[in-house]
Amino acid sequence: LSIRRQRQMCIRDRELYEAIAGEGRMLSKRLKEALNYRKGGNTGFETCITRLQMQSYVCIADFVYMQDRYGRPYGWGVAEYATPEELFGYDLITSAYQRDPQESKERILKHLQSRLPNATEMQLEKIIKG
């Protein structure tokens, strides 16, 4: 695990993370099957995957649609998870480690201002803090 990844992680979170990191990208459906998150098996998949996303260990790379027998997509998209390093490249991710938190906050605010030009500073701060 990289420097960022050395924080404590519970066993189930670590299993999920390692499964995703080992494959590069992995559909939630396959993750649940591989790690026995089904009736009578492990519980709490959504809790673990949400915690990993909130801590920036994994993110949703895409939504993939199942296909019918004619090859047409149908239904809801299934989340495909990946690590940030897989999506954006190791160098880009590790380059952000050198920034101090205030600089990161300013960069986020600047980006949000470009996307939401009518928003006030207070509204943008609220978006960041949640």
Roles of regions detected by a PLM:
Residues L1-I11:
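Single conserved hydrophobic/aromatic residue that forms the stacking wall/gate
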Residues R12-R38, D91-T94:
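Short acidic, glycine/Ser/Thr-rich loop/turn "cap" segments at secondary-structure junctions
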Residues R12-Y17, S28, F45, P101-L109, ...:
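Short, leucine-enriched amphipathic alpha-helices that occur as contiguous helical runs
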Residues L16, I60-F63, W76:
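Surface-exposed cap/loop segments at beta↔alpha junctions
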Residues Y17, A21, K32, E46-I49, ...:
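Short, well-ordered alpha-helical packing segments
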Residues G22-N36, I108-K110, S114-G130:
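Short acidic, hydrophobic short linear motifs in intrinsically disordered regions
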Residues R38-M54, I60:
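Short amphipathic alpha-helical interaction segments
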Residues Q67-S114:
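Short, amphipathic alpha-helical interaction segments positioned at domain boundaries
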